[in-house]
Structures are given as C-alpha cells and as structure tokens.
C-alpha cells in the first residue's frame, strides 16, 4: 500500500481539523487505538508486540506516521508482524503531531483504505511519529490513546507532565530494565505518575523481560470488550 501524504489547501497551508468532533464508534467499526510518545521510547516495538499477540485472535491493521520516510511501517513488514497489506504509512512532511491532531485527513484516508481492503477489522493501531510530551491524538481520529515514555529519559519524565503523560488513556513507562544503568528510580516514577494522572491507569514494562507486553495487552483486550453504542 503506497504511503499517504499530509495535504495542504490552495494557500499551501495544512487543512485544519482541530475542531473535528469526537469520533463516535458504531457497531461493526474497528476500535482505533493511538500509540504516541517521544522518539525512541519504544512505540514501534510495542505495536509489534501487540500485533504478534493479537493477530491470531482478531482482525487488525496498523497505520504508522513518519516525517519523511516509511521507516516504522517498513520495520513492521520486515518482522512480518502482519501481512503487508495490513500495514499502511503516512508521511507527514512536518511536525508529527500535525497529522494526528491538527490535520488528520491523511490518516483518515489511510484508515478508509485499510477498512475498504478488509471485510472486517476489529482493531487499527495508529502509531504517531516520534514527538515530544505535548503530542496527543485528535479525538476525531482515535477512540483511545496510549502514550509511551521510557526510563532512559530519567525518572523525571512523568512529573514533567504534558498532555500525553497526564491525559492519555494509558501511560506506558517502557524499558524498566534500563533503570539501574541510568540511575532512574522506578518508585519515583510510579509516585509521580499517580500524582499527575490521578485515577488514569499507567503501567511499567520491559519488552526485553516480557516480549508480550502483558499489561498493555490486557488493557487493549479490555478496550475491545467495551460495548459499542448504537
């Protein structure tokens, strides 16, 4: 499937969809889960792990976002986590958050192509390009979102806050196996995550220790069980 590109209007400015209404999922539509977070936090590795665990029990597809390449989609194809036609890519050509929050047209077009190409999809994972702590998905694009940070950034990351850390439906603190090497205190990260997120869930994982991403997998399965209105 060829990559989709972020479009612009006649003035050369990106189309604006920041005010797009929240998506209302209807029966028969796939659940859309956004996976965002900084560069190198482990988003693609997490998506790959989820695909490996879920591909035999449901119908799923993946949509990746990169600025100038299709590197993340290519990685998933090389590792055969799904058939090639179930992996699509958007090339944003600019700040990654633009394509998942401000102008979601290219992502919506790619999702339409995935849905049209498969009789019934249960789940679409939408991975953002690597960005900073301010990146979030438009509620018109995804139903729920995961935000991934990693221990290598230091135990200060959760208390820095930001929309992704604070308001995502699930915060994933990845690469816990690196904590001793970088001097990060996991208890501090747990405390600060609880403080900034309140009752919103978070999990600490290491894909090295648990390649199945067990706690995230459990959360995704729980989202799939939520009744669809309609």
Swiss-Prot record:
UniProt-recorded Gene Ontology molecular function terms: GTP binding; GTPase activity; nickel cation binding
UniProt keyword Cytoplasm, yes or no: yes
SUPFAM superfamilies reported for this sequence: P-loop containing nucleoside triphosphate hydrolases
Classification via InterPro entries: CobW/HypB/UreG_nucleotide-bd, P-loop_NTPase, UreG
Disulfide partners: none
UniProt-listed GO biological process terms: urea catabolic process
Tagged with keyword Chaperone: yes
Gene3D superfamilies listed in its UniProt record: P-loop containing nucleotide triphosphate hydrolases (3.40.50.300)
Protein localization: Cytoplasm
Annotated TM spans: none
Main location: cytoplasm
PANTHER family the UniProt entry points to: UREASE ACCESSORY PROTEIN G
Assembly, per entry: Homodimer. UreD, UreF and UreG form a complex that acts as a GTP-hydrolysis-dependent molecular chaperone, activating the urease apoprotein by helping to assemble the nickel containing metallocenter of UreC. The UreE protein probably delivers the nickel.
NCBIfam families the UniProt entry points to: ureG (TIGR00101)
Protein name: Urease accessory protein UreG
Organism: Mycobacterium sp. (strain KMS)
Gene: ureG
């Amino acid at each position: 499937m060829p990559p989709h590109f972020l479009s612009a209007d006649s003035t050369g400015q990106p189309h604006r969809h920041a005010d797009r209404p929240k998506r209302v999922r209807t029966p028969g539509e796939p659940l859309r889960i956004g996976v965002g977070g900084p560069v190198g936090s482990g988003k693609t590795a997490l998506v790959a792990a989820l695909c490996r665990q879920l591909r035999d029990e449901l119908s799923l597809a993946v949509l990746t976002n990169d600025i100038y390449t299709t590197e993340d989609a290519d990685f998933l194809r090389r590792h055969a986590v799904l058939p090639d036609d179930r992996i699509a890519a958007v090339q944003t050509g600019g700040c990654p958050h633009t394509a998942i929050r401000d102008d979601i047209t290219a992502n919506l077009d790619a999702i339409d192509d995935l849905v049209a190409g498969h009789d019934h999809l249960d789940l679409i994972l939408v991975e953002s390009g690597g960005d900073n702590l301010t990146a979030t998905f438009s509620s018109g694009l995804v139903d729920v979102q995961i935000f991934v940070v990693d221990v290598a950034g230091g135990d200060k990351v959760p208390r820095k806050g930001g929309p992704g850390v604070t308001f995502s439906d699930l915060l994933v603190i990845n690469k816990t196996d690196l904590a001793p090497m970088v001097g990060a205190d996991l208890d501090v990260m747990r405390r600060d995550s609880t403080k900034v997120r309140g009752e919103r869930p978070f999990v600490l994982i290491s894909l090295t220790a648990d390649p199945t991403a067990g706690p995230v997998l459990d959360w995704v399965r729980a989202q799939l069980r939520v009744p669809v209105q309609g």
